[in-house]
């Protein structure tokens, strides 16, 4: 176990040699730098990252605890400080508009920058803070730089596509879809802004193709992690769109059972009910999502899955057009 980072370094080098990949000086430097000297801290970090991908409030609470434990074990663990910044910024965007979340995100980001200013994951944390302030283009600029250096950087493509979607650049999201899916590996979140953008562009055939791939990704993931409520809620929406109403209701019900007070689960349920043409249930779920903390008007108004609710007084009250 003591040589785990040396083994990772050697594996990365062997793969590069086997594929005849030319490694840049920056990449060589990155391979040579250990993220932390503490294996226990690294274990906490990886566990936290797994929870963080699920994006529900409870899972983010778990991830924040894991990342906090990691920096307690190694105060110089820049990736863990950056991960804390990401989680705090996401909390602010979707669950709690208290300025203290952004203050905490900024403090964690500053610690990460002070330790490792050029590490891609640290730059993603800076982008999350910009995103939380609605500075989508500035965030996207940072994320493009990150991706140019490390295509598979955790969460980079997902946040870039979110920025582009929120700023109405649907065609650009569509153009990045294949690269984003390939680079994001098992992170199913990347499918969300892609499907939303293809829906906004009315590219039905392309959307159905991506939808089938998203279904396969969720089904494979849930065989490994059956308690992932977010994945189930997203799968419910996919099933609804593909004409599988019973499967859709089953997954939506399971998701809400697993996380009954989660704004993201309720929001996705609203999208699912819209797809099933059940307007009253959709409005009810969306109102619950708003009360639970989902108050992102840019996202809700741009989401084609909620088109059924546009013009409804309750929808307009909850998610008004920004001045």
Segments from the language model and where they lie:
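Acidic, proline/glycine-rich low-complexity intrinsically disordered segments
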Residues: 1-191
